[in-house]
Amino acid sequence: MSGNTFGKLFTVTTFGESHGLALGCIVDGCPPGLPLTEEDLQVDLDRRKPGTSRHTTQRREPDQVRILSGVFEGKTTGTPIGLLIENTDQKSKDYSNIKDQFRPAHADYAYWHKYGVRDYRGGGRSSARETAMRVAAGAIAKKFLQTVYGVRIRGYLSQLGPIKVEKVDWSIVNDNPFFCPDADKIPEMEKYMDALRKEGDSIGAKITVVAEGVPPGLGEPIFDRLDADLAHALMSINAVKGVEIGAGFDVVEQKGTEHRDEMTPEGFLSNNAGGVLGGISSGQDVIAHMALKPTSSLRLPGKSIDVNGDPVEVITTGRHDPCVGIRATPIAEAMMAMVLMDHLLRHRGQNADVKVDTPDIAAIARVKAQD
């Protein structure tokens, strides 16, 4: 398996399986001198961890992270940062009945054909449990971006099944189990998920993530465009089946006069581009959306085959999220942070001395908005 490392200058390599002893990662490329503690990482890990509400998996993992290296006297040293989270609530026997069976729409079948062996306990390496380490690594990137450059990254659940958010109040996002920014929609989501759980079924979701204060100039055309790398990062998250930048697929119905983000000395008049022009950040908010499929691990019987190709009826009895999107917001934030951190370091290495006389109109607009 050769695809376990993300990034070029700010790199994150994760390891571990859902029911293994522990999960871990190595973060390399973080500049020295950044104040960093385990508590800094734990905030986002607690937002992501399982068992925090009746609407998520009841597997209860504390997800306590340990910093093994790369930090001395409370500051990063510039050397690789080693992180570890122990697994404490595995119930591998729950998966014994599917040892030789493939769950429909799960990674089981593809992993078997690629590797000839698979860890059937909770999906092994293909489990979304792996994302705990992404969140821990992303928290480092988020702190650097916020501390050094004033970049703020935050996200929210913008759609759960048929329920679409209609307004965004950032102040309530972390005060409900859905990361929902629309207070009027939370009771509706609660009712919907309670009914879904009784049915034994699952549902998909959509997450929106926004980076504010991103300087213009991040992104490396042609093949490492900022939006291309964002799409790559978000698509690498378990269950993600689609990514949009800015207006996304709505551009199909927009006319050019509507889509173009016109400019004035006071700022941009719209942000259909999602903060990226020509693969390079424009200084506007970077906005991305991702769609997550419903989990395929269900207690409802489904048709499949076993390792011999014979027909079987599959029932999954382990503990699973009825909607994986509910806990995906911190993961999306982490991946966006890692992309922006990597591109900022690349930009700083090659283009730090580039100066132009044209004002940063997005920054001007932000200042005026604060007045």
Curated annotation (Swiss-Prot):
Pathway: Metabolic intermediate biosynthesis; chorismate biosynthesis; chorismate from D-erythrose 4-phosphate and phosphoenolpyruvate: step 7/7. CDD domains: Chorismate_synthase. GO terms for molecular function: chorismate synthase activity; FMN binding. Gene3D superfamilies: Chorismate synthase AroC. It is an enzyme of class 4 (lyase). This reaction introduces a second double bond into the aromatic ring system. PANTHER family: CHORISMATE SYNTHASE. Homotetramer. This is Chorismate synthase. The gene is aroC.
